[in-house]
Each structure stands twice: as structure tokens, then as C-alpha cells.
Amino acid sequence: MLHFNQFVILSAELSHLTPQENEIRTNQLQLMLTKLGFKPTEMIGRYKGDQETSFFVPTTRNDDIERLEFIAFDRFNQESILVQYSDGHSRLHYPNYIEHIGKVREITRQEAFKRDAYTFYPKLGKYYAAI
């Protein structure tokens, strides 16, 4: 995951929806990302203590980030997306502001479970969080 310089992590899920509703939204997001030419990788995320399916999306251009913001905020009503820029620094992008949160780094499972937010890559069995 970290061999990409710039990437976005986003989800379509909302904590107040049913698992079935969130599954539909997740499938819609994956299809939308693929049709737009992105190569999303499915992850398991935790945000504000709630587990959700999220997507790791490598980006090469800043207008890719803007497109992903539009999808997340306008189509799926997301609170934020995580963006790691090519300088290695990560930020949470909200509709009206940006919060600097450090750098995304690999962490242990034990460290992950102590956090309110992390990303798990099932294929590699690795956990990541902004530190």
C-alpha cells in the first residue's frame, strides 16, 4: 500500500444504514470508481469506531483527488476522505476544510484495535493508520 506516493481512501457506507443498504452503496462506489478508470483495492476500515468497507485508490493528479471528493461528498454523503499526498503527509478532506493528520504507516494489529480509525488490507494481512 505505501509504495504508492499519492492515494485516497474512501467509503460509501454510513453508520446509520443497514448492512444491506451499505453493501449496495459499496458496490455502486466500486463500479463508479472502476468506470472512471481508477483501480480501487477493497479494504476494511474503521472510522470513528465503526467498521466499514473502504477503497484504497492510487492517484497521480490533483484533479483525481477533486473527482474523488465529489463522489464521496456529493454522491455518497461522506463526512471525509483520507488523502495521502506525494510528500507523504496525510490529510482528512472534509467538504469545507482539511485536517492534517500525519502520515499513513503500517501498525500492528494490537495498535490498530486501540484506535478509532485504521485500515486493514486483508490480502496482505496488514494494518495502517495515520500517525
Residue ranges of each PLM-predicted region?
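Short, low-order "capping/linker" segments at domain edges
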Residues: 91-115
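Short, flexible beta-strand-to-coil junctions
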Residues: 11-17, 60-62, 84-89
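C-terminal low-complexity, charged extensions that often adopt amphipathic alpha-helices
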Residues: 110-131
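Short, surface-exposed beta-edge/turn micro-motifs
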Residues: 4-7, 51-55, 77-80
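Short, compact, well-ordered microdomains
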Residues: 66-95
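Glycine-rich loops and low-complexity Gly/Arg-rich segments
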Residues: 33-36, 82-83, 105-109
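N-terminal, charge-rich interaction modules
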Residues: 1-41, 50, 128-131
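Short, intrinsically disordered low-complexity segments
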Residues: 35-71, 75
